[in-house]
Regions:
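NTP-dependent nucleotidyl-transfer catalytic core
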Residues: 1-145
Length: 145
């Protein structure tokens, strides 16, 4: 049985065809680590985990990379555009790095408690700003944005 996934670009379900035979690269956005998550925040990780497990059962080797937003998350539907970590830092008296480190541990503990398999590798947004800008440029160039 083939795997069919919804393609948000074409707005259709399409047969999954990996770029490399039996290998899948999966990049997902991780949490913004400034506060405790609620179950709605964790739902995407459950969905990605189910997809990873299906791919593995189908014989694919999955390399899953997840970013952790440890700075620069500026907007949501219900705020004034202030960086979430700067705001949490001001309110707690701790620096942004301490807050991020604490909530990364909370997030990883939540994954474990929910039996969600961890990504192959985590990386912090602050460690790869130049690379992310280039990645977005390539996606835009290819018409995905």
């Amino acid at each position: 049985m083939n795997i069919r996934l919804y393609n948000s670009l074409t707005k259709q379900k399409e047969e999954f065809k990996p770029i490399k035979k039996k290998e899948v690269g999966l990049y997902t956005c991780g949490p913004t680590v400034y506060d405790y998550p609620h179950i709605g925040n964790l739902m995407p990780y459950i969905i990605w985990d189910v997809l990873k497990r299906i791919l593995k059962v189908k014989g694919y080797k999955v390399k899953h990379i997840m970013n952790i937003t440890d700075v620069g998350h500026l907007t949501s539907d219900a705020d004034d555009g202030e960086d979430k970590l700067v705001k949490a830092s001001r309110e707690s008296g701790k620096n942004a790095w301490q807050i991020a480190e604490f909530f990364i541990k909370v997030f990883r503990n939540n994954l474990s408690n929910l039996n969600i398999t961890e990504p192959t590798k985590f990386f912090r947004a602050t460690d790869t700003v130049k690379e992310q800008i280039e990645f977005v440029r390539i996606l835009n160039e290819k018409g995905y944005l």
